[in-house]
Curated annotation (Swiss-Prot):
Residues 1-23 form the signal peptide. It is a peripheral membrane protein. Keywords: Cell outer membrane, Cell wall, Membrane, Secreted, Signal, Transmembrane, Transmembrane beta strand. The keyword Secreted applies. PROSITE patterns: AUTOTRANSPORTER. Residues 981-1276 form the Autotransporter domain. This is Probable outer membrane protein pmp6. NCBIfam families: POMP_repeat. It comes from Chlamydia pneumoniae (Chlamydophila pneumoniae). The keyword Ribosomal protein does not apply. Its main location: secreted. It is found in: Secreted, Cell wall; Cell outer membrane.
């Protein structure tokens, strides 16, 4: 055979290239078992391999090698490999390497420079290799720490590495990289000890624990230096995609109690990971030195560029519990840290005993906690600084579902001089001054629920301490029960801005406590903007101040600590929030709710300060520059402060109040310095109100007085313009030839008239307070200029001003008992000039005077224009005192200088004309001049009677007589229909009735309507003499109303008797012609005459409800009785027309009488109605046309007629009030003439059974009446 050279070369190359892939295979069986002493051999023979292609040990049975104390050759491991990769294949058997007392690197296994792997074991146990106490032990497994020297545990059922010791790194495994994967039952690394790094595992590069479905446990491992459970030095290490429970418990090291990594470390996609009771033992850390840090995990990066640091993401449950460090990071220490997309995260009872970050510490780079879909809990963690979290870079908590920080503590000594020690009970976010401008600081954003409760700091920031802090776009934020011994019970920001914006749910600060700033302490710009609801409740600043130069004990809820030099650029702003509430906050010194040198509250929909307290000043707010403007309703209620029950303005400060989109109300506020007195605002020495304005339709209410320090002698008196007119802004004309783009566009703004109202009232004061003049007196030591709108003094209020000037487009309203006067202290020239004075009629009683007085030494009093009377409650002319003539002194005018100028004053008000309703009369005003030029105006009243208001007139009461008339008339009409064409046999019948009646309004009386319906039952019989008799009973239910304020529900019970007979009478030829003789035939010579009569009685019961003017109701009920008699006759004439079989002229006489009993209304101020009655006599006449048909047996009738009321006794009643005032109430009477039409029909259904129906309409010039009835009749 011949071979070519090319083939030979190719085959040779193939053989040599496959040679490294052909690993040597060695079986291990029970014959390889070893136990010292059992075989009589003192030494174990080392299993050495050096095949460059690698070695694979395959178990054919369970193998156990135990109690190895000596080995041959010496200085070897049980398994030593110096060649290619070394593999152990369990083939579903177990391998035990136990109590290996050897001191070679890797007592059980030593592999040089190549990979080591374990796979397919039912159980792999490496125990005590070497055992604890073995001198010079160097771990159980050692793989040379060079690239390629990996140790892999994969696809095993159980792996146990325990009680191994080493004087070097990694007591259980030391390798370049380590991979523990796909364990199906359990992996246990327990009680391994290294005097260097990695109590259980140590990798020069990375460690990977991934894809294990069984449990993985690192417990009670110890490293003298780094990583009690694992130490990984370089490259990315991962704990990834484990579906079994992964537990790190009770591991100990100087640094990184459970796991220490000097490169990126990722814990991702695991089902449940638990770090419990791990700890570090190193000394306190220095900057950029992690020694002693990370009770559970330490991830330290020498350089953070392009590094992710520690990443914990997409885990279902991650828990750090009871981990401890002696330095920083009770659970975690990381240069950079990200917690992303986890379901449940728990940090509980972790401790940094002498350092920062009880749960987490990040050194210089960013910290991020984001996208958690379950609950993230930081609870009862402890550190000297940052009880739960400490960060020196940006700290971002964003997009989480539920964040809970509770019971965490910063325990640093309260007198420590160290920076931030004892601060941040839950979170401390600190920025070095060099990085402040480029970093965000603490950023809590777009979370659904964030709760920080029960956290404690021994210095500042009970929950949060931050250099810079922003809370943005969260749904619900809760700060509850946090405590700081020094400042900021909930939050303390150090130097930079604080913002809380865009919260879509409720933000609550409640029951937080600190010596200063019960809830929030800031030093920079502080902004609360566009939040749905802000609630500050029950927060306390508890210190008792020992000096007056700092803010200790100030700011029950918020203290914005701005220096005097920063007021121009920094402030506390609360703007555009839907709801803002400060409730029951307390400060030992100033600012029960807010303490801020500069504060702006604007654009919010609803604001409430209630029940806040400050022992020194400013029950709700203490400020130097305060502006409250453009909000919805604003209320200050039940606040108290030593000075300034609601608001205190510091010396030389300014206050601006504008009610633009809602009212501002001060009520129930008190000043508690000395004796408790009503007080809304106190202005310190030199302080002033710069703006007091209300937009049209809105009011500022001062139910508690304002107080103000007296001006210094010779000092400048500032002007206060009330409701100033803001002029329209008109853009300037553009230059003719200039380019349009170069001209700035100035927006057009309309003039703002500010025509709202400022009210000073004592109406809500307790009677014991209102009886003391000082409690009802507002003092404004300013020159008041009322430019527009209204100033109202009511219910005993006094307004003291330096001077008062009124512009013509404004009005001063005053009640009896109120006072407008100038002050007396350091006031020499204060004057009062009124141009439009209006006096409240309701308050005039002849006892209390309206006082206008100038008390300055040289000022004058001038009143001009027309005096006006206003009637606030609209009830003055209902006062029974106006029944008689009166003389009422009501206006007292005086001036110390004696100058009272009334030259241009018209004291006969145009508004004093006789009213439309109430007591009638006329006024005359008489001025009386007394000593010193004092002028008293006396109002003289000449009484002329009483005119009730429409709601008191009650025309529906007499009109109910017409309702009874309509009802009884309709009953008789129904009986007439039922008796028409009645058979001669006895029978019974039943029918239904419906009525609708409307009467138009007349000049004095309201219109009314009636709707009633009911039923009627009757029977009839005919005597042999052809006399027909009938009897009937009926019941009706009615509703009527008067289109003003009253309505009546009625029930009617009625009985009727009816008789009918017919005769034939001869007619003379002159009587046979009639008005329609040209259309209808004349009457025959002998004509039948049909006579009928009816007598009816009805009892009517009425229940009336009246809506009275004071939003109450009056109830009445009474009875009335109806009597009706009707007699009449008709002359039926037969015809032979196809569609008209007969016609009948007729005439009737109807008499109706209704009598009504007197009654009294049930109401706060009841009316009494006397008895009344109605009598109406009418004569109806007309023609009835009839068409009869045999098939089917039926008859149709049409009646047209005219009626005149020949006699009427018009209904009316005497109406009285309990005070004796009375008037006559007349019914809205019907006109006397009526036209009516009725269509009716009868149809025979069966033998003895027929039905009937009719509909009619009666028209009068002022009323319409409609009736419909139907029924059926059975004849025996």
């Amino acid at each position: 055979m011949k071979y070519s050279l090319p083939w030979l070369l190719t085959s040779s190359a193939l053989v040599f290239s496959l040679h490294p892939l052909m690993a040597a295979n060695t079986d291990l069986s029970s014959s390889d078992n070893y136990e010292n002493g059992s075989s009589g051999s003192a030494a174990f023979t080392a299993k050495e391999t050096s095949d460059a292609s690698g070695t694979t040990y395959t178990l054919t049975s369970d193998v156990s090698i135990t109690n190895v104390s000596a080995i041959t050759p010496a200085d070897k491991s049980c398994f030593t490999n110096t060649g290619g990769a070394l593999s152990f294949v369990g083939a579903d058997h177990s391998l035990v390497l136990q109590t290996i007392a050897l001191t070679h690197d890797g007592a059980a296994i030593n592999n040089t420079n190549t990979a080591l792997s374990f796979s397919g074991f039912s159980s792999l146990l490496i125990d005590s290799a070497p055992a604890t106490g073995t001198s010079g032990g160097k771990g159980a497994i050692c793989v040379t720490n060079t690239e390629g020297g990996t140790a892999t545990f994969t696809d095993n059922a159980s792996v146990t590495l325990q009680k191994n010791t080493s004087e070097k790194d990694g007591a259980a495994v030391s390798a370049y990289s380590i991979d523990l994967a796909k364990t199906t039952t359990a992996a246990l690394l327990d009680q391994n000890t290294s005097t260097k790094n990695g109590g259980a595992l140590c990798s020069t590069a990375n460690t990977t624990v991934q894809g294990n479905s069984g449990t993985v446990t690192f417990s009670s491992n110890t490293a003298t230096d780094k990583g009690g459970g694992i130490y990984s030095k370089e490259k990315d290490s991962t704990l990834d995609a484990n579906t079994g429970v992964v537990t790190f418990k009770s591991n100990t090291a100087k640094t990184g109690g459970a796991w220490s990594s000097d490169d990126n470390l990722a814990l991702t996609g695991n089902t449940q990971v638990l770090f419990q009771e791990n700890k570090t033992t190193g000394s306190a850390a220095q900057a950029n030195n992690p020694e002693g840090c990370g009770g559970a995990i330490c991830c330290y990066l020498a350089t953070a560029t392009d590094k992710t640091g520690l990443a914990i993401s997409q885990n279902q449950e991650m828990s750090f519990t009871s981990n401890t460090t002696t330095a920083n990071g009770g659970a975690i220490y990381a240069t950079k840290c990200t917690l992303d997309g986890n379901t449940t995260l728990t940090f509980d009872q972790n401790t940094a005993t002498a350092g920062c970050g009880g749960a987490i510490y990040t050194e210089t780079e960013d910290f991020s906690l984001k996208g958690s879909t379950g609950t993230v809990t930081f609870s009862t963690n402890t550190a000297k600084t940052g009880g739960a979290l400490y960060s020196k870079g940006n700290s971002s908590l964003t997009g989480n579902t539920n964040l809970l920080f509770s019971g965490n503590k910063a325990t640093g000594p309260s007198n420590s001089s160290a920076n931030q020690e004892g601060c941040g009970g839950a979170i401390l976010s600190f920025l070095e001054s060099a990085s402040v401008s480029t970093k965000k600081g603490l950023w809590i954003e777009d979370n659904e629920n964030v709760s920080l409760s029960g956290n404690t700091a021994t210095v500042s920031g009970g929950a949060i301490y931050a250099t810079k802090c922003a809370l943005h776009g969260n749904t619900t934020l809760t700060f509850d029960g946090n405590t700081a011994e020094t400042a900021g019970g909930a939050i303390y920001t150090e130097t930079e801005d604080f913002t809380l914006t865009g919260s879509t749910g409720t933000v609550t600060f409640s029951t937080n406590t600190a010596k200063t700033a019960g809830a929030l302490h800031t030093k920079g710009n502080t902004s609360f903007t566009k939040n749905k609801a802000l609630v500050f409740s029950g927060n306390s600043a508890t210190a008792t101040a020992t000096t007056t130069t700092d803010q200790e004990g100030c700011g029950g809820a918020i203290l914005c600590n701005i220096s005097e030099s920063d007021i121009a650029t920094k402030s506390l702003t609360l703007t555009e929030n839907e709801s803002l509430s400060f409730i029951n906050n307390t400060a030992k010194r100033s600012g029960g709710g807010i303490y801020a040198p500069k504060c702006v509250i604007s654009g919010s929909e609803s604001i409430n300060f209630d029940g806040n307290t400050a022992e020194t000043s400013g029950g709700a707010i203490y400020s130097k520059n305060l502006s409250i403007t453009a909000n919805g309703p604003v209320s200050f209620t039940n606040n108290s402060g030593g000075k300034g029950g609601a608001i205190y303005i510091a010396d030389s400060g300014e206050l601006s109040l504008e009610a633009i989109d809602g009212d501002i109300t001060f009520s129930g506020n008190r000043a508690t310095e000395g004796t408790s007195t009503p007080n809304s605002i106190h202005l310190g020495a030199g302080a002033k109100i710069t703006k007091l304005a209300a937009a049209p339709g809105h009011t500022i209410y001062f139910y508690d007085p304002i107080t103000m320090e007296a001006p210094a002698s010779g000092g400048t008196i500032e002007e206060l313009v009330i409701n100033p007119v803001v002029k329209a802004i008109v853009p300037p004309p553009q230059p003719k030839n200039g380019p349009i783009a170069s001209v700035p566009v100035v927006p057009v703004a309309p003039a703002n008239p500010n025509t709202g109202t400022i009210v000073f009232s004592s109406g809500k004061l307790p009677s014991q307070d209102a009886s003391i003049p000082a409690n009802t007196t507002t003092i404004l030591n300013q020159k008041i200029n009322l430019a527009g709108g209204n100033v109202v003094l009511k219910e005993g209020a006094t307004l003291q001003v330096y001077s008062f000037t009124q512009q013509p487009d404004s009005t001063v309203f005053m009640d009896a008992g109120t006072t407008l006067e100038t002050t007396t202290t350091n006031n020499t020239d204060g004057s009062i000039d009124l141009k439009n004075l209006s006096v409240n009629l309701d308050a005039l009683d002849g006892k209390r005077m309206i006082t206008i007085a100038v008390n300055s030494t040289s000022g004058g009093l001038k009143i001009s224009g027309d005096l006006k009377f206003h009637n606030n409650e609209g009830s003055f002319y209902d006062n029974p005192g106006l029944k008689a003539n009166l003389n009422l002194p009501f206006l007292d005018l005086s001036s110390t200088s004696g100058t009272v100028n009334l030259d241009d004053f018209n004291p006969i008000p145009s508004s004093m004309a006789a009213p439309d309703y109430g007591y009638q009369g006329s006024w005359t005003l008489v001025p009386k001049v007394g000593a010193g030029g004092k002028v008293t105006l006396v109002a003289e009243w000449q009484a002329l009677g009483y005119t009730p208001k429409p709601e008191l007139r009650a025309t529906l009461v007499p009109n109910s007589l017409w309702n009874a008339y309509v009802n009884i008339h309709s009953i008789q009409q129904e009986i007439a229909t039922a008796m028409s064409d009645a058979p001669s046999h006895p029978g019974i019948w039943i029918g239904g009735i419906g009525n609708a009646f409307h009467q138009d309004k007349q000049k004095e009386n309201a219109g009314f309507r009636l709707i009633s319906r009911g039923y009627i039952v009757g029977g009839s019989m005919t005597t042999p003499q052809e006399y027909t008799f009938a009897v009937a009973f009926s019941q009706l239910f009615g509703k009527s109303k008067d289109y003003v304020v009253s309505d009546i529900k009625s029930q009617v019970y009625a009985g009727s008797l009816c008789a009918q007979s017919s005769y034939v009478i001869p007619l003379h030829s002159s009587l046979r012609r009639h008005v329609l003789s040209k259309v209808l035939p004349e009457l025959p010579g002998e004509t039948p005459l049909v006579l009928h009569g009816q007598v009816s009685y009805g009892r009517n019961h009425h229940n009336m409800t009246t809506k009275l003017a004071n939003n109450t109701q009056g109830k009445s009920d009474w009875d009335s009785h109806s009597f009706a008699v009707e007699v009449g006759g008709s002359l039926p004439v037969d015809l032979n027309y196809r569609y008209l079989t007969s016609y009948s002229p007729y005439v009737k006489l109807q008499v109706v009488s209704v009598n009504q009993k007197g009654f009294q209304e049930v109401a706060a101020d009841p009316r009494i109605f006397d008895a009344s009655h109605l009598v109406n006599v009418s004569i109806p006449m007309g023609l009835t046309f009839k068409h009869e048909s045999a098939k089917p047996p039926s008859a149709l009738l049409l009646t047209l007629g005219y009626a005149v009321d020949a006699y009427r006794d018009h209904p009316h009643c005497l109406t009285s009030l309990t005070n004796g005032t009375s008037w006559s109430t007349f019914a809205t009477n019907l006109s006397r003439q009526a036209f009516f039409a009725e269509a009716s029909g009868h149809l025979k259904l069966l033998h003895g059974l027929d039905c009937f129906a009719s509909g009619s309409c009666e028209l009068r010039s002022s009323s319409r009446s409609y009736n419909a009835n139907c029924g059926t009749r059975y004849s025996f």
